[in-house]
């Protein structure tokens, strides 16, 4: 009985993540893990999570290797005025607390009118990163900075 409840909970977690990716961070204001920063003329929504929360199908569609030691950074950039998704170039890095730097390679994913930028970040259990991402649309350049601690599931 406990196993069945745990299994149902995992299915629900995976379903919720698929929904969040499908409709985008634009509509995830009520998700506690969702975060937003206002950078110039943009609303930048971002979330960092473990890739094990992705279903195998979603991971495969986005060429993401699911692992308890892989984190996923998902970012969307919206125009502050009309809330349209912005096509930008992202470069970034993640630095752990002992100074090891890992480059972030972002992949642009378009779903309808939504645009997401995804990067995979390998990590060790309970590893904390300072993440810095340069965002450039050719007219404006801003830097998104945040910290996140990853846990192996």
Segments predicted by a language model, with ranges:
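N-terminal signal peptide c-region/cleavage motif recognized by signal peptidases
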Residues: 28-30
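Short edge beta-strand/loop segments characteristic of extracellular beta-sandwich folds
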Residues: 72-78, 118-120
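Aromatic sugar-binding surface patches on proteins
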Residues: 111-118
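Short acidic/polar inter-strand loop motif in beta-rich domains
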Residues: 137-144
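N-terminal secretory signal peptides that target proteins for export/translocation
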Residues: 1-13
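Short, aromatic- and glycine-rich surface loops/edge beta-strands on solvent-exposed regions
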Residues: 129-136
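Bacterial N-terminal signal peptides
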Residues: 15-26
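Beta-strand-rich domain onsets/edges
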Residues: 34-72
